[in-house]
């Protein structure tokens, strides 16, 4: 029988005997337990015995997320674009499309842990000593949450099932103590004997979302409690979309627009499949006067583009913040990139459809000077119209949205490409290699399916049937990729489709862009708070080589976590002389018959939920000027049976 099945049987027996008096759960351990004793000791699943109280001060303390007040002004349409002719972007409308949960502050515990209360210590000990628990077979631990009413302020009792040893553990709260009292001598005295091995992890808080963990092992009788020379260093940073700052907000807004366009395309095709007849929805624009738009389109297509595509000066290195700022106002050189800035401002689907008609009329009648260089479907249509090789397209259904999505994905990728290459954080090849499976043959006019795949899209290996035949946009028979979800009618092979949309492919591309953006956020925070210029290339490479997590929607709560290893000498000067924010120290001693383990946990904040923490008396930290810690001690004794 598996270990989980054995522990589940113990849980069932405890429920039968004690379920009426106490709340008993079988699942993941509480977050505070994992922090105090360590993830390895806590395990993935435990049986936890406690009392549940859903009354009290939870709501008053506002420790859980609360829904933000709904926005009352304006239209229901989403406006993330602003006008291309004036700076009037209103980003507050983001809340209209997401569940906006405002966190008063981030809590280290879960919501359900706020309702947990301890049971009397003597009651917990009586269950531990009961015959049925002593004779039960299992693997894993039963933990009893206590009320701290005893002299030692016991918080948790542990009964561990072990086939060869008797194993017990006790976790108690030690109050608040100044940092200068945390010494090797004091810890060894608490441990009771000279440790054979000591594992130490110091955590330094750089900002509320960034921490540096320094860890090492020592066999000394009095181990060093601070070691910045040969420790293992891990940098952890959490980026939450809702915390996106003004420097990168514009790029995140563009990414959100692309996500919403994709959602509306998928929704439209789903309704069509179900027999619902309606026009698609476009909800991302601020609105623009159509006469202004016509004039802007004509000017964009007939003006000569600038020749400046890069700001690089030989091997000069630029400050990453400065590069991001310049990327926001960089000169766009490709026609479809400029058209993205115009077309995304349309107020509705109807306006967007009219805008494309004006665009096609201009392409067919005007002398286009600014020939598109991008390899997307819209660029090909404009080129063929200008060369009189294509009849005037009449867009219908989701085609305007699909064309807009494709040029938007390509333009935003170029923004990120500019940032990464100009700041010398990585080469274009790295972005290519990680966002596309192979290099593309951009110059082949016969390889039309490749035209809709921009630099960052994963390339399929399917050959195009009849690749040797001469193909034009009027006579194109595309191969259907059975591995993807494409939306096309029964006449998909009857002629050229004005646009292309692949649900899975679009998800992959948006997910890659989100990964690139999150990497940028992580690097910016490293630059602002640590200024570790020498590690940016390695960090960038490590993060971008990871498979991106699939992102189908973006709201303020979406987050990304970076956890990377650094060399100690990079952070030594930054951390020298500073007290850790938290400390986790484990001492072990053992002989042939017995093993003693003592874990000390110190944290600048009380990591227990308020109603649980108030059961333990502590001094007022506000009255102490120097660094102080809430402290816990965990003793575990394992004896041979």
Swiss-Prot record:
**What is the consequence of disrupting this locus?**
Lagging chromosomes at anaphase and precocious sister chromatid separation upon activation of the spindle checkpoint. In spermatocytes the number of Golgi structures are not affected but they show a mild defect in shape.
* Classification via InterPro entries: Zwilch
Write out the entry's keywords from A to Z: Cell cycle, Cell division, Centromere, Chromosome, Cytoplasm, Cytoskeleton, Kinetochore, Mitosis, Phosphoprotein
Phosphoserine is found on 312
Example of a GO cellular component annotation carried by this entry: cytoplasm
- Highest taxon of source: Eukaryota
Which Gene3D superfamilies does UniProt cross-reference here? 1.10.287.1880, 1.20.58.730
Q: Does the keyword Cell cycle apply?
A: yes
The subcellular location is:
Cytoplasm; Chromosome, Centromere, Kinetochore; Cytoplasm, Cytoskeleton, Spindle
Q: Does the keyword Coiled coil apply?
A: no
Q: Which GO terms describe its biological process?
A: cell division; mitotic spindle assembly checkpoint signaling; protein localization to kinetochore
What quaternary arrangement does the UniProt entry report? Component of the RZZ complex composed of rod, Zw10 and Zwilch.
Functionally, this protein is described as follows: Essential component of the mitotic checkpoint, which prevents cells from prematurely exiting mitosis. Required for the assembly of the dynein-dynactin, Mad2 complexes and spindly/CG15415 onto kinetochores. Its function related to the spindle assembly machinery is proposed to depend on its association in the RZZ complex. Failure to assemble the complex due to the absence of any one of its components, results in the incorrect redistribution of the remaining components to diverse membrane compartments.
Q: Which family does it belong to?
A: Belongs to the ZWILCH family.
Q: What is this protein called?
A: Protein zwilch
């Amino acid at each position: 029988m598996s270990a989980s099945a054995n522990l589940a049987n113990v849980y069932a027996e405890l429920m039968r005997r004690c379920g009426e008096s106490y709340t008993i759960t079988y699942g993941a351990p509480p977050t505070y337990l994992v922090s105090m004793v360590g993830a390895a000791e806590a395990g993935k699943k435990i049986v936890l015995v406690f009392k549940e109280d859903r009354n009290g001060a939870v709501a008053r303390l506002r420790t859980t997320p609360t829904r933000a007040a709904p926005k009352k002004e304006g239209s229901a349409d989403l406006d993330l674009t602003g006008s291309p002719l004036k700076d009037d972007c209103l980003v507050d409308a983001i809340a209209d499309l997401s569940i906006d949960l405002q966190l008063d502050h981030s809590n280290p515990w879960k919501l359900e842990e706020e309702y947990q209360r301890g049971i009397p210590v003597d009651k917990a000990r009586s269950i531990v000593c009961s015959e049925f628990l002593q004779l039960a077979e299992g693997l894993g631990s039963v933990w009893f949450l206590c009320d701290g009413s005893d002299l030692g302020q016991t918080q948790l009792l542990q009964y561990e099932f072990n086939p060869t040893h008797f194993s017990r553990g006790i976790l108690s709260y030690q109050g608040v103590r100044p940092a200068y009292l945390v010494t090797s001598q004091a810890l060894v005295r608490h441990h009771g004997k000279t440790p054979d091995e000591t594992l130490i992890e110091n955590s330094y808080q750089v900002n509320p979302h960034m921490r540096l963990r320094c860890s090492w092992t020592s066999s000394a009788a009095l181990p060093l409690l601070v070691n910045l020379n040969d420790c293992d260093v891990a940098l952890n940073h959490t980026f939450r979309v809702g915390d996106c700052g003004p420097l990168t907000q514009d790029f995140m807004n563009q990414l959100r627009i692309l996500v919403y366009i994709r959602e509306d395309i998928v929704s439209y095709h789903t309704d069509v499949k179900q027999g619902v007849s309606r026009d698609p929805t476009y909800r991302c624009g601020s609105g623009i006067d159509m006469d202004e738009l016509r004039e802007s389109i004509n000017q964009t297509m007939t003006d000569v583009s600038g020749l400046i595509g890069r700001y690089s000066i030989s091997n000069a290195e630029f400050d990453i913040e400065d590069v991001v700022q310049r990327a926001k106002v960089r000169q766009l050189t490709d026609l479809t990139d400029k058209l993205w800035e115009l077309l995304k401002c349309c107020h509705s689907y109807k306006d967007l459809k009219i805008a494309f008609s004006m665009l096609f009329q201009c392409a067919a009648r005007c002398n286009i000077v600014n020939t598109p260089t991008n390899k997307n479907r819209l660029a090909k249509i404009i080129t063929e119209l200008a060369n009189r090789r294509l009849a005037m397209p009449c867009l219908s259904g989701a085609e305007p949205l699909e064309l807009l999505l494709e040029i938007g994905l390509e333009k935003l990728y170029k923004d990120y490409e500019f940032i990464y290459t100009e700041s010398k954080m990585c080469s274009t090849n790295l972005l290519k290699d990680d966002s596309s499976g192979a290099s593309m043959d951009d110059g082949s006019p016969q390889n039309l399916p490749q035209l809709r795949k921009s630099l960052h899209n994963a390339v399929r290996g399917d050959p195009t049937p009849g690749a040797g035949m001469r193909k034009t946009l009027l006579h194109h028979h595309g191969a259907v990729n059975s591995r993807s979800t494409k939306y096309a009618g029964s006449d998909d092979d009857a002629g050229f489709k004005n646009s292309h949309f692949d649900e899975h492919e679009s998800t992959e591309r948006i997910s890659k862009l989100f990964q690139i953006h999150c990497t940028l956020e992580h690097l910016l925070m490293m630059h602002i708070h640590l200024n570790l210029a020498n590690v940016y290339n390695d960090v960038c490479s490590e993060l971008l080589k990871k498979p991106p997590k699939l992102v189908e929607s973006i709201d303020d709560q979406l987050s990304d976590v970076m956890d990377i290893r650094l060399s100690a000498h990079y952070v030594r000067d930054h951390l020298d002389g500073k007290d850790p924010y938290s400390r986790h120290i484990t001492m072990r001693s053992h002989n042939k018959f017995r093993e003693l383990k003592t874990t000390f946990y110190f944290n600048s904040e009380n990591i227990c939920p308020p109603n649980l923490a108030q059961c333990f008396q502590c001094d007022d930290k506000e009255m102490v000027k120097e660094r102080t810690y809430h402290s816990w001690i965990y003793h575990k004794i394992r004896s041979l049976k």
